[in-house]
């Protein structure tokens, strides 16, 4: 059915209600036929069925279509998958009287059967979505932003709290050493060795180097 498009206050035209998925499919097919080798589709929630429904419609017309999917930190993964687990339990006829679907993020549910089932769904999400929706590559946008913010929050709480410097040593440096993380020798990772080689090349024994036998990085083996 043809409709006269209505212009929004922003100056853009509103899509006809209910056509959003159809438009995604059309755009994906057109992009592939124009030379694209991978698709990027955003979804409202990380739901394997929803992703697969869209991609499989694209593959009906372009059977080799492959998808890049953003495992986005914008999703509340815990809440979304607890809701999915809750709905699955209801569909299976299980007793869900111990849970309030509107409050599934509550810490009181963290070690429950539902929470464990939800975590298992998260654990297999990439494999499930790759199998069902032909996802070629999963990525996480902004993982370093969130991990840095979390770790600095934890470090600040400990460092300015009762643990003092132990907060850094126990949770950062010792972990780097035990796990063989190269960045524990941050001098080398920042290029000080290269700088020393450069100085030595031009100044020989007169070079004032950052490294050498007394370099603190030699404390790490």
Q: Which ranges hold each PLM region?
A:
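Catalytic beta/alpha-barrel core
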Residues: 39-52, 70-71, 91, 113-115, ...
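Short, acidic/polar
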Residues: 19-30, 118-128
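Catalytic domains of carbohydrate-active enzymes, especially glycoside hydrolases
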Residues: 27-40
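Active-site-adjacent beta->alpha loops and helix N-cap segments on the catalytic face
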Residues: 1, 21, 45-62, 77-81, ...
């Amino acid at each position: 059915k043809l409709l006269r498009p209505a212009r929004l206050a922003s100056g853009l035209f509103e899509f006809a209600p209910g056509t959003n998925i159809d438009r995604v499919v059309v755009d994906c097919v057109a992009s592939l036929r124009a030379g694209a080798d991978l698709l990027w589709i955003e979804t409202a929630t990380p739901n394997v069925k929803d992703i697969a429904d869209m991609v499989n419609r694209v593959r009906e017309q372009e059977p080799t279509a492959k998808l890049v999917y953003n495992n986005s930190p914008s999703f509340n993964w815990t809440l979304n998958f607890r809701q999915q687990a809750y709905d699955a339990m209801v569909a299976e006829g299980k007793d869900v009287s111990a849970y309030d679907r509107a409050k599934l993020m509550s810490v009181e549910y963290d070690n429950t059967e539902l929470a464990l089932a939800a975590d298992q769904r998260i654990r297999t999400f990439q494999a499930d979505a790759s199998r069902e929706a032909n996802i070629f590559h999963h990525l996480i946008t902004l993982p370093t932003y969130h991990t840095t913010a979390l770790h600095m929050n934890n470090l600040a709480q400990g460092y300015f709290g009762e643990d003092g410097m132990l907060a850094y040593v126990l949770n950062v440096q010792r972990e780097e050493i035990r796990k063989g993380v190269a960045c524990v020798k941050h001098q080398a990772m920042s290029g000080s060795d290269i700088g020393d080689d450069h100085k030595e090349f031009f100044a020989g024994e007169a070079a004032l180097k950052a490294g050498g036998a007394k370099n603190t990085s030699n404390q790490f083996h």
